[in-house]
């Protein structure tokens, strides 16, 4: 060893030695609290551990007081389906027939701005390991992406790297990417959002949890070697705001520069991923689980070994001793603090009984996975870490992992909120003639907000493994879980920063309602929720008001729907200088299908001459709409009303209709309104349709409202002609508005199918396709 190690003994003897705690993200009072806990100054290694584990990213210190509301609103009935919930690596729910599903979404926002490819790739890798750590086989991924304006100079650099990173890592793992969203808005220019979701399946009896139990049990680190990449990732990169000088710099071509000047200094904080190592690690873990060789397990993600050791020890019934020099390294002369803080990817930490160590190692050798015993469980109640025989960490593990600082940040509704709400879309000029309506449709379909995402999704493998039932053009992805019975799951993620900016409580509920509805339109029964809450700086009282309102909206909404929030993630400091992103609570909903053969597609045309029926009510609701953005760059007013009872009724009707074969296709009505849903379903089915205006929408701007309103709680369904009377009777009996609005029409033989709005305009399918599919290649191709 070439440098003196800061041991516990030395720390006790040098109480006045200056320490760089502020540079590591700790505040003065936090540092003093650490000294009180230990009765001395921390060693360098202890300081590193506390700084990463007490970071905003790991400790939830600003959000914890609000997140408790999820638990307070979860009833015992809602808990019945949960096998693991908030506090575990991922939520796990019972999906029937002895099967369970686990799912979670996490952010990798700041790393994906600084080094888009690796930031996005390791975001996928990290969430996949969270799912692995529950004892499950990962089976699919989804992503929620937010970029700056599509024509902004730096958007090309970020989008290109992010999409290649997601595709490169997920495709190499053999995981289908079954859906998501890509949204463009100027507020994300210096702070893109990359939220990755993974879902896994397991038999209920195979569930694994993160705890270190049984004195004498061994701690085994397995997977990749530990290097210098990712150090400071959670304490610096994910827990502070980008400076105001960091937007818009850097190279714009793939591989052409890592971004802004200050951000270049943070490059070591971006992890480097190897999907092929992770693929082998997945198979190795599954074999270890099958042989019952694991007592407890934790992945190494944010905060690396600091997190894995402290969380395992804290959740267990004793303590832990670790010999840090046993950790396999890939960089020379790493210090204990660096080893503990490294966020090198593709690593796991397992608790194994002594008699199973040899068998564990044999499985790892079979898969060519490096595995090393680095310590053991003790009954001391402390986490002790040594370096070549000298103690460098001696702490109560709960103070590191679970008893960090908790802040009740000031919460203040912004003074600007009233003016934002008062600035409605009512004064914006509305199209009135058929020609104007047609031009409006083409402008919206041809905008980056609503155009085809095929340029992005075609870079992902959506059908690898052979169990993807719905992915392309679908509202929610559908996967087969059991090939014998056909049991499956559906999943969707949604968010609206625009609605949440206008009303955070309603915005979160609108995101929940849309994700719930998107699962329901597949024919699945929605059963559980996860989330990723992306907001600006928690030090801004206005941001904390947005956050607290969104949490309450989401929790109250889940309680109203009777489905539990199983876990989630909070990402603060998403802002550049003083400019925050649109508040973006991403909501994921999981649903169950008894048999995936009865899933409902999006595409029209599976039955000749299908009747088109609109479920739900249409109101004059354009505040926060895509129409207002595309035609006027406007954001203001009050978002659409949420009716969660109506959402439940819609789900019940759609589930029954899919079971009884009454509906041949279904599509959620959301951004862009009914006409956008019609166009998407027609393009998916490569067919045309005729739309007839219902009563009450013929005069004045009624046609515009009918076609473009973004009223919530609506679904467009295609019904076989033979089942129309049965289906409408069922809707009537249940009190669900069902309006016949047209028919699917292939057009004249040999002619081009069209979308016709009777008495208003006609547009050809090919013109719609060209308009929609040409946008992103034109910008980023």
UniProtKB/Swiss-Prot annotation:
Name the InterPro entries on file.
Answer: PRibForGlyAmidine_synth_PurL, PurL_linker, PurM-like_C_dom, PurM-like_C_sf, PurM-like_N, PurM-like_N_sf
Region (Disordered), start-end ranges: 1-23, 245-269
Q: Where along this sequence does the record place binding of Mg(2+) 2?
A: 130, 299
Q: What is its main location?
A: cytoplasm
Cellular component aspect of the GO annotation: cytoplasm
What GO terms describe the biological role, i.e. biological process, of this protein? 'de novo' IMP biosynthetic process
GO MF terms listed in the record are: ATP binding; magnesium ion binding; phosphoribosylformylglycinamidine synthase activity
Pfam families named among the record's database cross-references: AIRS, AIRS_C, FGAR-AT_linker
Binding-site residues for Mg(2+) 1, renumbered to this chain: 106, 569
Catalysed transformations (reactions): N(2)-formyl-N(1)-(5-phospho-beta-D-ribosyl)glycinamide + L-glutamine + ATP + H2O = 2-formamido-N(1)-(5-O-phospho-beta-D-ribosyl)acetamidine + L-glutamate + ADP + phosphate + H(+)
Pathway as given in its UniProt record: Purine metabolism; IMP biosynthesis via de novo pathway; 5-amino-1-(5-phospho-D-ribosyl)imidazole from N(2)-formyl-N(1)-(5-phospho-D-ribosyl)glycinamide: step 1/2
Q: Active site at which residues?
A: 57, 108
According to its UniProt record, this protein's enzyme class is ligase
Q: Which UniProt keywords apply?
A: ATP-binding, Cytoplasm, Ligase, Magnesium, Metal-binding, Nucleotide-binding, Purine biosynthesis
Residue positions binding ATP: 60, 104, 531, 568
Q: Report biased composition (Gly residues) as residue ranges.
A: 245-259
User: What's its job?
Assistant: Part of the phosphoribosylformylglycinamidine synthase complex involved in the purines biosynthetic pathway. Catalyzes the ATP-dependent conversion of formylglycinamide ribonucleotide (FGAR) and glutamine to yield formylglycinamidine ribonucleotide (FGAM) and glutamate. The FGAM synthase complex is composed of three subunits. PurQ produces an ammonia molecule by converting glutamine to glutamate. PurL transfers the ammonia molecule to FGAR to form FGAM in an ATP-dependent manner.
Family, similarity comment? Belongs to the FGAMS family.
Summary of subunit composition and partner proteins: Monomer. Part of the FGAM synthase complex composed of 1 PurL, 1 PurQ and 2 PurS subunits.
State the protein's name: Phosphoribosylformylglycinamidine synthase subunit PurL
Native source organism of the sequence: Mycolicibacterium gilvum (strain PYR-GCK) (Mycobacterium gilvum (strain PYR-GCK))
